[in-house]
Amino acid sequence: MGIFERYLSVWVGFSILLGVALGLWQPAAFQAIAALEVAHVNVVVAVFIWVMIYPMMVQIDFSAIKDVGKNPKGLLLTIVINWLIKPFTMASLGWLFFTVFFADFVDPASAQEYIAGMILLGVAPCTAMVFVWSQLTKGDPNYTLVQVSVNDIIMIFAFAPITALLLGVTDIVVPWQTLLTSVGLYVLFPLVAGVVTRKYLNKNSGANSDANSHTSSDQSSDQSSHASSNENSHASNAEASLTNFLATLKPWSVIGLLATVVLLFGFQAQTIISEPETIVLIAIPLMVQTYGIFIIAYLAAKWLKLPHNIAGPASLIGTSNFFELAVAVAISLFGLHSGAALATVVGVLVEVPVMLSLVAIINRTQHWFK
């Protein structure tokens, strides 16, 4: 484990401080970067997230995806958490905190907008960053891909009606461009790149294996034994080639995460300084929701006797959010400077530190699933 992985929480904390400092020092530069958007998806952030996702996509073996159906409980858990529990607990917590606990600190109109923003986060399960969290918990990359894909399909049909139900708004317009752009950037493109890379590594390792086999075939008369040896050699070379390639990528994956944190906090530096009390008030129920959903999902995974490499990602998909979609809908419904938009932004700021703490919990409780 390298210095970045060993002290990841420290590096993230430093990146948060650096992002805020740079955002205050060079606000124009961050505004220019923030303006580089396609369908409310920031291109620069997308590149860094792509750098984080790509290593896991290289690990995906399509020949093994068919085996995912042998353990459907992980998929079922993810679906139940994301669509039957999470949106409604988020709405309940938003109402409880902002109409009861924080009623003396927030005016009713602002409270309703904050609740709306929290609901939008609750109805949008993660598409991109879950690949990063899965990789950090040594999750099954094939299973994670299927989990994310199934949730993306459900989201297309369920996001608008659940959002309308909880917000009490009937004319919810799903920003299809944002949704499809995000799925393309964070799932399809890196997946294709990963598949092409894996095939290239296998082809090269196969060529090396064939070269070695021709050298030894002149000295061997047992053809069947030679064929078996050649197969094993090819598999061994392919695995070694993949392992070496992933080891080369690993530092870049962590650097991508830290760069993303710097950008996200740099974008919101002015808001963090100008409205710290509001941000704290919004962050509290969001953190309660995140840890609460994780506890429910993780304990359910243990009860279902899921293997650790499925239980971890299954518990993290629901706790992480599709913030691009939530921000886009908040802006379209309530406006750029609304309380709802602010709440979705706070969700972005809270997510990385909280999710890293959950990653640490999953890694330290691996023995629960043995």
Residue ranges and their predicted role:
Residues M1-V58, S63-T319, F323-K370:
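Alpha-helical transmembrane segments of multi-pass small-molecule/ion transporters
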